[in-house]
């Protein structure tokens, strides 16, 4: 099976606090993987390293590959980082869309990496590109909102627009950081259904950070759980049982309660 993401000996320190400890991880083509863990476990930090949004410590032997290209090595970004980013879609908790633009215009932003520079200066997109953007919006159930401003949409609708933008980008990997954290249950279900549909029917690899274990169990075949910057569990979601859940979350809560009591 083709390895899409490879992480070796990744460490990260913030202000003398070590957020990640020599993490090793391989993610294969077509997987939908949940990164789980309590707040401060390192899951979002790990996700942001995968495409070089942040760099790791200058540890000997640390290395990250994405789509067969080096992203960073020993704390330094690769010179051709844009080539791997060009096929990587991002979905963030805070949506990361341009509120003053329409839904369609936001989706067309996904085509910038494959559009000649002179056309991007004038926001000129071809008829074929606009048609593809509308198809992407149809895919996520948002085509009827194409000409509305993004600022008029709900949080769940904005996340679906972000997914459509990744489709427009022709992403081979989608990295989603807490995409349902601020959504109501119905909106969260629709967003996760959309990600799973893209994963299963398009073969796009999806890595998603989640707080909600029930969503990870329902939508992802594989769970990678982090605890205090270490990989605590990496395996089939169906084997992530109550004992592992208790050790991952409740032991952390007890430490926090004891600290408050002191």
UniProtKB/Swiss-Prot annotation:
Q: What is its EC number?
A: 7.3.2.2
Give residue ranges for domain ABC transporter: 5-253
Q: Which Gene3D superfamilies match?
A: P-loop containing nucleotide triphosphate hydrolases (3.40.50.300)
Q: Give the location in the cell.
A: Cell inner membrane
Keyword Zinc-finger appears in the UniProt entry: no
CC terms in the record's Gene Ontology section: plasma membrane
* Any matching Pfam family: ABC_tran
Q: How does it assemble?
A: The complex is composed of two ATP-binding proteins (PhnC), two transmembrane proteins (PhnE) and a solute-binding protein (PhnD).
List the protein's name: Phosphonates import ATP-binding protein PhnC
């Amino acid at each position: 099976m083709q390895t899409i993401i490879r992480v070796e000996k990744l460490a990260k320190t913030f202000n003398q606090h070590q957020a990640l400890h020599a993490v090793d991880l391989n993610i294969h083509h077509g997987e939908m993987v949940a990164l789980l863990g309590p707040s401060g476990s390192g899951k979002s930090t790990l996700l942001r390293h995968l495409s070089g949004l942040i760099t790791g410590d200058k540890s000997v032997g640390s290395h990250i590959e994405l789509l067969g290209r080096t992203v960073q090595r020993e704390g330094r970004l690769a010179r051709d980082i844009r080539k791997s980013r060009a096929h990587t879609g991002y979905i963030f908790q805070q949506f990361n869309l341009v509120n003053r633009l329409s839904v369609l215009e936001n989706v067309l932003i996904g085509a910038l990496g494959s559009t000649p520079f002179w056309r991007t200066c004038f926001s000129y997109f071809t008829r074929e590109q606009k048609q593809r953007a509308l198809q992407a919006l149809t895919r996520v159930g948002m085509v009827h909102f194409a000409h509305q401003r993004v600022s008029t949409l709900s949080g769940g609708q904005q996340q679906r627009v972000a997914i459509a933008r990744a489709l427009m980008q022709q992403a081979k990997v989608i990295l989603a950081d807490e995409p349902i954290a601020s959504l109501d249950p119905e909106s969260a279900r629709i967003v996760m259904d959309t990600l799973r549909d893209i994963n299963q029917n398009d073969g796009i690899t999806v890595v998603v950070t989640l707080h909600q274990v029930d969503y990870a169990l329902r939508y992802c075949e594989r769970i990678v759980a982090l605890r205090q910057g270490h990989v605590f569990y990496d395996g089939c979601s169906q084997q992530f049982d109550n004992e592992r859940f208790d050790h991952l979350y409740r032991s952390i809560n007890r430490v926090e309660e004891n600290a408050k009591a002191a």
